[in-house]
Amino acid sequence: MPINSRTKGASYERDIVKILNEFFLKNNFNLTCKRNLDQYQTKNLSDINIPFHAIECKHYKEGNWLKPDWWKQVCTSAEAEGTIPVLIFKFNRVPTRVAI
């Protein structure tokens, strides 16, 4: 059965939110984050917001490095929000990578 890319992306965003929130809690940061559900209704919004950062998450089946369009997308979101762009991306059977 084919995988719905929107569902796969949302699941990956939830995984990243969980990892970030566990990190914040473990390291006594007074922060929490959640998925930005407004991203589906409003253009140029990031997937996840934490103070001063716009986070875009990408999970694809194949590849080994970020696509320039992904970086442009997160930079556009960050500029609109006045924050620092962060791209978190993963391909199947490849570790997660982060570009800042």
For each feature predicted by the language model, list its residue ranges.
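Catalytic phosphate/metal-binding cores of nucleic-acid and nucleotide-processing enzymes, i.e., regions
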Residues: M1-I100
